[in-house]
Amino acid sequence: AGNNMVGWLYNKGVKGAEIIACNTDQQHLNIIDADRKFLLGEGVTRGLGCGGFPEKGAEAAKESLQEVKQSLKESDMVFVCAGMGGGTGTGGAPIVAEVARATGAIVIGTVTMPFKIERARVDKAEFGLERLRDVSDTVIVIDNNRLVNIAGNLPIQQAFAVANELIATMIKGIVETIAVPSLVNLDYADVRAIM
């Protein structure tokens, strides 16, 4: 889910931001468009993903800590996009957010939560969300259960596209309001002051 958001954001085109994708699943990473991308935890997952285990996602992110630090070192604001309930997003996103915060960046978690019928994923998602909240300045949650209200009777892939569009438009709006001179002048210091 997180890399799908990232790819959608990249394709939308955001002025003033670098779009970075990281994943434990090499195949999925290969099909995502981004300015920069890298595999998390190659030694832990061998590029095959985390199998839904958040501990493995955290371990993979920790293994790639130097690459994460290098990618985020000069960032003023970092949006950490992830799907909660699986392995990589649930376990890895809080580690990435922690690194971003250590650089002094404003950290905004942007996550999707699983459907209630995905019971096994819901508990993991709640745990991951709490961890992410602990290390982020704010977290924006898109609940898949509410997606049904927004997307109506659309097929599931189109409903997810609606969510990705919503997230991408929001991030683009925030970034470009700060980075691109316009009639509405909001600078980074203003944002830092309200976080």
Regions found by a protein language model. Give the residues of each.
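Tubulin/FtsZ superfamily GTPase core signature
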Residues: A1-M195
